[in-house]
Amino acid sequence: MKILFIPNWRVNRLSTDVPTIQAPDKQVQGEPYWFFKYFPEGTQVDIIDIGKENQFRKIEHKIKFYLVQPWKAFCVRKRYDLVISHGAQSGLVYELLTSFVKRKPQHLMFDIGGLNGARVNHTEMPLIRWALRKAPHIIVHASRQLSLYAKHYPKLTPKATFIPFGNDVDYFTPKEVAMKKQILTFGRAKRDNDTLCKAFSGIADKKGYKLVVVGAGALKEKYPDGDIEFLDPMPLKDLVTLSRESAFIVVPLPEYLYSYGQMSFLQSMALGKALIVTETTSSTDYISDAPGVERLRHAPAAWTRQP
């Protein structure tokens, strides 16, 4: 089987493995790429990524869709048995192009961001319905996202499937280290770090613990509290070390009707860390009612009222 993979990120082509680069971001010569290592032996996977930054990419970022990459995929589609797009920014445009031709391979699209960020926009939605009128197969990593299709894109529902997001347990492994009296949170996009910092600041007796915030430096002036430390984004290997040294990890997620933040809390779990995560569309499928797991039915803002 020949597969063409079109992800909405750039993939590093390497002659030898670099362990500090996560599996989705690298293709090592002579080794199967990412989750395709679980496919039958002999499966050929070619990748067309989004390419290097340039002036045209700035236009693509502005319109929030990739154009060059899907066009390249469209031009070579006949060479493949299956085309897999990861992200609607790539998949929507590719599907639109192939809707005008009769001969095309099967198209499987991972819809991470709810097509258009799950926006109920009556200008955008008819265009999306038209682009997807041939209804490709779709995989989502948040089961609640299926309700978006049922309500606004009913023709997609029969071909949409929820499959839980996987984690690289070979890279993220538990390790015994000396823990510090610190609580860690990380990530800039789609994080309610403001509420977390406000809640932590309201705790009278912090028992000697500090909150370490990675990647949200814009809040530094708002929370000059010496018990909150702000760090710049760091290499993954350094973040893993910091995670292992922390007493526990908090992933404060706002609510969106699509997948986000899953790598952060699943990787933390794979490291064997105690974890607090907001129950949202993105996380609810990964929270089990099991010993050691407790669900607190509060909106994130309640943290500031009940620190």
Language-model features and meaning:
Residues 147-151, 164-180:
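Acidic anion/phosphate-binding donor-loop and adjacent secondary structure
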Residues 22-23, 178-225, 229-237:
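Conserved catalytic-core segment of nucleotide-activated headgroup transferases in glycan assembly
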Residues 71-79, 118-138:
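Membrane-proximal helix-turn-helix segments that form the acceptor-binding/catalytic region
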Residues 115, 162-172, 217-219:
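Short beta-strand->alpha-helix junction loop in the catalytic core
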Residues 237, 251-267, 279-285:
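Nucleotide-sugar-dependent
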Residues 135-158:
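A short, active-site helix/loop in glycosyltransferases that binds the activated sugar's phosphate group
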Residues 243-258, 273-274:
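Acidic donor-binding loop of glycosyltransferase active sites
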